[in-house]
Regions:
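Active-site metal-binding motif and surrounding structural segment of the metallo-beta-lactamase
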Residues: 87, 112-113, 123-175
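Feature captures hydrophobic
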Residues: 435-438, 444-450, 454-457, 461, ...
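Surface-exposed loop and adjacent secondary-structure segments within mature catalytic domains
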Residues: 163-217, 229, 258
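Hydrophobic helical h-region of N-terminal Sec-dependent signal peptides
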Residues: 6-18
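Conserved beta-strand hairpin/beta-sheet module of binuclear metal-dependent hydrolase folds
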Residues: 80-140, 264-269, 273-279
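Divalent metal-coordination and catalytic microenvironments
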Residues: 93, 108, 118, 133, ...
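Metallo-beta-lactamase
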Residues: 113-115, 121-123, 225, 229-235, ...
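Accessory terminal helices/loops
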Residues: 21-76, 192-223, 311-319, 326-519
Length: 620
């Protein structure tokens, strides 16, 4: 963040944000976040095998004292709470390592080993968490892993805690909700490259953390930069009420598909009266549609499952913990927390739909909807991650899609072309920029952005407009209560000033590729076909993978790649090889000579184009 565009309007906006927040004198969250602290690492830096730092616990040491002028005071408070790192006792037999990654790792003491809920994002941070637990509580092996849901910050560190050979031998169980593996790999396959680029904005990954950069991610301090892995589940949870005894510990499960993830579940420990609500009730409003991109979630289903959680466990839960943030203690406190959290999602859904049925569009709903004071005053319903504004548009999108029914929007111009025409119609870029400066001086930041954005989209080389727009993004980032809105504003500002940093093509981890079903990989090839390369050509190759007893025919005709399993009729060309060798050639770029008609396969692969990892966002 360069020198912040200062002035009375910014000061008033920040003061207004503080006044609108709940009671800053309410210190209950600080008690909950600090309760049960045991210890943390002596060395704050967690490194990979090559010495690269993948996580730095000292990166948040700046979060002391009052909020500076560059950070919303409410967000500063949330980041201070999330910055508490180390090993914490939750209740007898249950501990958490918090602050070692975006999510928490929960350790339950079994008869012989640890039952770990959610082994973080990276193998390195997961290993550091396990080492800390064993150092402070006594060394034990990991007896079981439990994945609460199918997002990588909850399973990517698996190999840091278990050896896959022990899993294959049956010495370690890996438990997950039904559909976990399918959704864990699918989310990052078809749209993975675009999601990865947008995630850089959401998490502010290219910016240094601090008062002028990312100030947490709203649900954690950030995402570790280590080795992402996947150890496949050995046991699926298929119904609510299913009970297991794992290493002597009774566990009961509630399936919650379609809430924060398409495959998700809560875990209840009846003998400890402890409930894990996964990512269904974090200390913030969550995303119904994540800005990085994903399928829209169902706010109504989310609320309904929290109602079910209250019915199943509300009168027998003394401790509540989640996959992010800090625990809650006391039956009445927990019941009220879950109920008000539920009510926030239900209100979001119902009122967005009511306004939609009154004819309002997504942006109009977002500009009108407000939580009732009884819900909005709770810190845990504030929009540190998801926001009411963004989520209300997601509800509209779920039911109505992108089209608002106005015929003027049936065939819109490209944004750059439309912007160029708007700028010309308004008298040229200098006049439009002057109007933008007037809007900013009047405190109308959003109109200033709308005007300056038109200039930049029309002409990315307009340096004064780029710098002005970057400055307004700095200002909006400083005001944002949402950590990820702040990150997106500040990343946009950086790219307006310095351009897009060259990226490397996103590649799935070896574990992820191994776990991906072959049909999904062939679908990935299909969305990479460039019709300019295949124009007027045709190709067909049979792929035979004896190690998996699979046979597919992949064909390109009419500039479309299609495939079929167990094809009939003779093949035009055939490649027979272990699937791992095919993956290495097709997706990793290895130069291997595959048995069979390798030339035909290479010709077909030549029609494909790798995704662009560094496409522009704030310019065109």
């Amino acid at each position: 963040m360069k020198k912040l565009i200062a002035g009375a309007a910014l000061s008033l906006a920040l003061a207004g944000a503080a006044r609108a927040a709940p009671d800053f004198n309410d210190r209950r969250d600080f008690d909950f976040a600090e309760r049960g602290f045991v210890a943390t690492r002596t060395d704050p830096k967690i490194t990979a095998a090559d010495g690269r730092v993948v996580w730095d616990l000292s990166a948040d040491d700046y979060l002391k004292g009052p909020a500076p002028a560059t950070v919303n005071p409410s967000l500063w408070r949330q980041a201070q709470l999330l910055s508490r790192h180390g090993l914490f006792k939750v209740t007898d037999g249950v501990w958490q390592v918090r602050g070692f990654d975006l999510a928490n790792a929960t350790f339950i003491a079994g008869k012989t080993g640890w039952i770990v809920i959610d082994p973080l994002t990276s193998a390195e941070t997961a290993r550091a968490a396990l080492d800390l637990v064993n150092e402070k509580l006594g060394a034990r092996p990991v007896a079981a892993l439990i994945y609460t849901h199918s997002h990588i910050d909850h399973f990517g560190g698996a190999r840091g805690m278990v050896d896959p050979a022990d899993v294959e031998a049956g010495r370690v169980q890996v438990i997950a909700p039904q559909g976990f593996l399918e959704h864990a790999v699918s989310e990052n396959i078809i749209a993975g490259p675009a999601m990865a680029r947008r995630a850089l904005y959401q998490f502010g990954s290219v910016l240094p953390r601090g008062p002028t950069g990312p100030v947490s991610s709203g649900i954690g301090q950030g995402v570790s930069a280590g080795t992402q892995t996947l150890v496949a589940p050995t046991l699926d949870i298929v119904r609510t009420g299913q009970e297991l005894v794992v290493d002597g510990v009774r566990l009961q499960f509630q399936l919650t598909p379609g809430t924060e993830a398409p495959a998700e579940m809560n875990v209840y420990l009846p003998d400890l009266k402890a409930l894990c609500l996964a990512e269904n009730a974090n200390a913030t409003m969550h995303n119904v549609l994540t800005p990085r991109g994903a399928l829209v979630r169902d706010a109504k289903v989310w609320a309904d499952y929290l109602t079910e959680s209250l019915r199943l466990y509300g009168d027998r839960t003394d401790v509540l913990f989640t996959s992010h943030a800090w625990p809650r203690f006391g039956r009445e406190v927990i019941a009220d927390y879950v109920a008000r959290h539920r009510d926030a999602y239900k209100y979001l859904h119902d009122q967005s739909v009511r306004l939609m049925n009154d004819g309002l569009t997504g942006p109009e709903i977002a500009n009108r909807i407000r939580l009732p004071e009884a819900l909005d005053r709770e810190w845990y319903n504030r929009g540190y991650y998801g926001t009411l504004s963004f989520n209300s548009r997601a509800v509209y999108q779920r039911y109505m899609g992108w089209y608002d029914a106005n015929p003027a929007n049936l065939a819109p111009l490209d944004p750059a072309d439309e912007s160029a025409r708007y700028v010309a119609a308004m008298g040229g870029p200098d006049k439009v920029l002057a109007r933008a400066r007037e809007a900013l001086a009047a405190g109308d930041d959003r109109w200033a952005v709308a005007l300056a954005n038109r200039i930049v989209l029309a002409d990315a080389a307009n340096a004064p407009a780029r710098e002005f727009l970057a400055g307004v993004y700095d200002r909006l980032g400083a005001q944002a209560e949402s950590a990820i809105w702040r990150n997106m504003y500040l990343t946009g500002a950086q790219e307006l000033r310095a351009g897009v940093r060259p990226g490397r093509p996103p590649t799935a981890s070896a574990d992820m590729l191994r776990a991906t079903p072959t049909p999904m990989l062939l679908d990935l090839m299909a969305v990479r076909l460039d019709p300019e390369k295949s124009k007027g050509q045709a190709a067909s190759v049979d792929l035979v993978f004896p190690d998996r007893k699979e046979h597919f025919r992949v064909a390109v005709r009419n500039d479309v790649l299609t495939w079929e399993a167990d094809p009939k009729g003779p093949a035009e060309a055939t490649v027979t090889a272990p699937r791992a060798q095919f993956l290495a050639v097709a997706f990793v770029g290895a130069r291997l000579q595959l048995p069979g008609d390798a030339a035909a396969l290479q010709r077909l692969l030549g029609f494909l184009t790798p995704p662009r990892p560094d496409f522009p966002i704030v310019t065109r």
